[in-house]
């Protein structure tokens, strides 16, 4: 999958989960500090990433600091491809 498709797919998932388009315009926005993503949203995010991109990220191994901005999430998905 092309990087642009991954980026747009991840941003669409984040916008749907957070209810905010800010995630599409500020890719360094801290999703947890701003309250846009919580633990339940994190589980939903991981399920969506697995479903759409085949990314395996067990909740038990989830390190919030590695997944706290749209840019970091996009990079994780790209690495998994």
UniProtKB/Swiss-Prot annotation:
Disulfide bridges in this chain: none
Pfam families: PP-binding
Annotated family: Belongs to the DltC family.
NCBIfam families (alphabetical): dltC, PRK05087.1
The entry's keywords: Cell wall biogenesis/degradation, Cytoplasm, Phosphopantetheine, Phosphoprotein
Localization per record: Cytoplasm
One cellular-component annotation, GO: cytoplasm
Metabolic or biological pathway: Cell wall biogenesis; lipoteichoic acid biosynthesis
Main location: cytoplasm
PTM entry text: 4'-phosphopantetheine is transferred from CoA to a specific serine of apo-DCP.
Sequence positions bearing O-(pantetheine 4'-phosphoryl)serine: 39
Function description: Carrier protein involved in the D-alanylation of lipoteichoic acid (LTA). The loading of thioester-linked D-alanine onto DltC is catalyzed by D-alanine--D-alanyl carrier protein ligase DltA. The DltC-carried D-alanyl group is further transferred to cell membrane phosphatidylglycerol (PG) by forming an ester bond, probably catalyzed by DltD. D-alanylation of LTA plays an important role in modulating the properties of the cell wall in Gram-positive bacteria, influencing the net charge of the cell wall.
BP GO terms, sorted: cell wall organization; lipoteichoic acid biosynthetic process
Record's protein name: D-alanyl carrier protein
Ranges of residues in domain Carrier: 1-81
GO molecular function: D-alanyl carrier activity
């Amino acid at each position: 999958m092309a990087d642009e498709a991954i980026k747009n797919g991840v941003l669409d998932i984040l916008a749907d989960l957070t209810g905010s388009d800010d995630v599409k315009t500020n890719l360094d926005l801290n999703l947890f500090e701003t309250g846009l993503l919580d633990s339940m949203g994190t589980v939903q995010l991981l399920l969506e990433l697995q479903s759409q991109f085949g990314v395996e990220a067990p909740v038990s191994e989830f390190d919030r600091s590695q997944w706290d901005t749209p840019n970091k999430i996009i990079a994780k998905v790209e690495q998994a491809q």
